[in-house]
C-alpha cells in the first residue's frame, strides 16, 4: 500500500513555534478542565496521562506538568506510555480508582509535540499536528464510564515506532538533532508493514472492536456519537460506514492527526454539541492495539 493512498483529508495542522513547549499547553488545557469542573489543584488526587515526545526518556514530562499546575505533593503522577490510547487508558484507570473509593477526583492530561519528531520525506509526516488536552474524572452523572474493550496485535510491535534513527535524503545519511540541545532526537517511523496494517488490520479492527463493545452493552449505534483516531479520511469514512453511529465528529481538516491528544481535544471541542445517549471513543495505537471506551452522556 502507498502512503499517499491513505493519508488524505488534511487541510491544516497546528505546529509549536520555536521556543514553545507542549507542557505549557497541557497546563492551559488542565486549567480549563479544572475550571469547568469547579475544582482547584488541591482537589486532585491523581494525575494520569502522558507527554510525548518527553524531554527525557525518563522521567516523563507529566511530572513537570504536576509542578507547573501547582498540584499538591500528595498527588500521584501516573504516566501511561501507550501512544495513542493514553487518554482513554487514563480515563479508565481514573474511573476505576473512583469506583474503588481510592480517589475522588483525578486529572487526565495529554500533550503531543510530534511535528518536531517526524521524517518529512515520508507521506504520513505532514498529517501530524501538535496539541494538548485534559479532563477531570470524578463523581458525575455526565460522561459516565460504562465499559471499555481492547484488541492487541502484538505481532505488529515493530510497525509503528518512535526512536533514534538515521534518515536518508538525496544520498545523504542524517542523524536528526534537537535544535535547542544539539543532541540526537527521536523520530517516528511507520514501516511498510505498519502502513499495510493501517489499510488492513487497523481498518478492520476499529469497527469490530467498536461494535463488539456496543453489543456487549446492548447499545445501538444510532444511540452513539463516535470519536476516533483521525489520520486518514479514507479510513474514517470506512469506519463511519461500518459502525453507522448517529453522529461522527472529528477535526481532521482543522487540526490534523493530533496522535494521543486527539481524543481529549475533540471531546472538549464538541462537548456542548453531543446530544446522543452515549459517546464512543476508539483509539488506534502503537504496539499494536485498538481500544474503545463507551461513555453514557
PLM feature segments, named:
Residues 1-15:
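N-terminal amphipathic/basic leader segments beginning at the initiator methionine
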Residues 24-34, 125-252:
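Hydrophobic pocket-lining "lid/loop/helix" segments that shape and contact the acyl-thioester
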Residues 12, 44-48, 69-80, 116-119, ...:
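Glycine/charged-rich beta-loop-alpha catalytic/anionic-binding loops adjacent to active sites
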Residues 27, 53-54, 72-74, 81-102, ...:
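Claisen-condensing/thiolase-fold acyl-transfer catalytic domains that form or cleave C-C bonds
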Residues 19-84, 88, 216-236:
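Conserved beta-ketoacyl condensing-enzyme motif
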Residues 1, 28, 88-161, 264-297:
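Conserved beta-strand-centric core segments of catalytic alpha/beta enzyme folds
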Residues 60-63, 120, 262:
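Generic recognition of short, well-ordered alpha-helical segments
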Residues 2-6, 56-70, 108-112, 180-181, ...:
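Acidic-glycine-rich active-site phosphate/pyrophosphate-binding loop
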